């Protein structure tokens, strides 16, 4: 009887202790038609990171700024939907403060949802931003990766046009995120 009571207590404890808010957005994604098996690995101009693109039709665009480097790829599907993946690297100074950064993002952008994504072996913050003034309107999934040792901030975003079924289009691009690699 004691063992039975102990089991009930443990089951109750673990079910209450589970963080239901940390559900990964991509848990609901099914298969993707973005095939990277014959893809092309592309790197940013300074060699901080790389990722796979499906083929040359995704037209990579690189940029280098004073403190940043970035790489964007994109394509338009046969039914007219926009698919864009961007990764950027920047150095930061001072101590990184997630709460302060999140408050700034929410102040500066139309954040419609926040969450977590499991990427590169860790849970990462996710901000879903609706750009209403764009034409067409777009929605972007921003994921932050902070390297406190090298004081580096990597921002990844998946963007598609806003409208019905945008979540499935974001899910289609999941393999692009998974192919992201940091080069130290």
Question: For each of these PLM feature ranges, what is it?
Answer:
Residues 1-14:
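Sec-dependent bacterial lipoprotein signal peptides
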């Amino acid at each position: 009887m004691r063992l039975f009571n102990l089991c009930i207590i443990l089951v109750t404890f673990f079910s209450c202790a589970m963080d239901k808010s940390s559900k990964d957005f991509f848990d609901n994604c099914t298969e993707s038609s973005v095939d990277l098996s014959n893809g092309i690995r592309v790197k940013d101009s300074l060699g901080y990171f790389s990722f796979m693109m499906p083929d040359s039709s995704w037209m990579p665009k690189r940029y280098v700024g004073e403190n940043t480097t970035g790489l964007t790829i994109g394509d338009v599907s046969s039914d007219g939907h926009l698919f864009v993946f961007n990764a950027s690297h920047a150095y930061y100074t001072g101590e990184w403060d997630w709460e302060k950064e999140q408050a700034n993002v929410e102040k500066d952008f139309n954040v419609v949802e926040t969450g977590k994504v499991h990427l590169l072996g860790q849970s990462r913050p996710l901000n879903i931003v609706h750009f209403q003034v764009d034409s067409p309107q777009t929605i972007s999934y921003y994921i932050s990766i902070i390297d406190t040792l090298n004081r580096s901030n990597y921002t990844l975003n998946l963007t598609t046009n806003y409208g019905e079924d945008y979540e499935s289009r974001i899910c289609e691009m999941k393999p692009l995120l998974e192919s992201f690699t940091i080069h130290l």
